Amino acid sequence: MPPIDFAVLAQVCAPWVAPQTMAAIVKTESSFNPYAIGVNGAKLTRQPANKEEAIVTAQWLIAHGYSVDLGLGQINSYNLRKYGYSVSDAFDLCKNMTLSASILEHNYQSAKKAGQGDQAAFEVGRQ
């Protein structure tokens, strides 16, 4: 896979969130690994080497009851179902960025409505 031009990806796929904000989140969540899989309560022996391996691994984990976080923004498997995304979508760079930014924005706005300050709302938005 060619190197990711993250600034362009963020600008095209999640233009309503500052690219610097998305970069900080993705760096923390996946270290910019588009095939990253985080298994909540467990750990993979190794991370997938490509998109196909990531999809098969994630599908197996979900089918066996694991809660997993997928791709650049580490989208949780619960949110895939909630927002109508597939496991394959989670490993599509643009779709992952779009959904990650949408979840961030939704959670941020919900926290603001609940009276949280900007920084506290941002922390809630990242969850």
What are these regions (language model features)?
Residues 7, 19-23, 95-105, 123, ...:
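Solvent-exposed, polar/charged alpha-helical surfaces in well-ordered, non-transmembrane soluble domains
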Residues 50-118:
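Alpha-helical segment that forms one wall of the substrate-binding/catalytic cleft
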Residues 24-29, 74-78, 125-127:
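Short acidic/histidine-centered micro-motifs embedded in hydrophobic/aromatic stretches
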